[in-house]
């Protein structure tokens, strides 16, 4: 998430039931994660906390990045372990999970629903940086710059289909560390805050 408007790596837990105080965990490795999906599910050793996808906001001249993987926190070792990237069996492209939801299925699966299209969202959140960079270059044609500014202004005005939200169930197996997709439906194509 964010803290004071900047991406954060902080992670906390509270004992359940009866907890009354937050306990700080080791920081989530890698880039900050805004709008990830999260779930508690079993791996081969017991319950773990899974944090998947999200995006690292732009910081200065560093562009925003949509994460294509996730991390598993194992309470028994108090450590984070990198999950496989979201490249489901048979796919050549990596997927992202920003603004989606996670639901447990059975004893070792997590089903992810919805979320933004990685390429469209990443282009949109980085468009202001691209405009800044191109505005500083006198060789850039004004029409190109105006088109980018128009795209920035119109980004939130398109019909829902234009955004190509994820319309497949994305399923992660916690023991084999693998991804598959299943079932396509426009009803799955949602993004939430």
At which residue positions do the language-model features occur?
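Kelch-like beta-propeller repeat domains
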Residues: 1-193
């Amino acid at each position: 998430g964010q803290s004071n408007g900047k991406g954060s790596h902080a992670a906390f837990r509270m004992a359940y039931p009866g907890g009354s105080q937050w306990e700080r965990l080791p920081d989530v490795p890698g880039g900050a994660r805004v709008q990830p999906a999260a779930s508690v599910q079993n791996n081969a050793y017991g319950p773990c906390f899974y944090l998947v996808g999200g995006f690292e906001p732009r910081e200065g001249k560093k562009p925003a990045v949509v994460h294509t993987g996730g991390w598993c926190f194992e309470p028994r070792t108090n450590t984070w372990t990198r999950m496989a990237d979201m490249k489901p069996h048979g796919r050549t492209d990596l997927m992202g999970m920003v603004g989606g939801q996670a639901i447990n299925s059975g004893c070792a699966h997590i089903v992810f629903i919805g979320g933004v299209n990685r390429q469209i969202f990443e282009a949109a959140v980085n468009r202001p940086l691209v405009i800044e960079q191109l505005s500083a270059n006198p060789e850039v044609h004004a029409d190109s710059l105006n088109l980018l500014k128009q795209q920035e202004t119109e980004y939130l005005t398109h019909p829902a289909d234009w955004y190509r939200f994820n319309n497949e169930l994305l399923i992660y197996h916690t023991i084999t560390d693998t991804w598959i997709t299943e079932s396509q439906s426009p009803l799955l194509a949602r993004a939430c805050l």
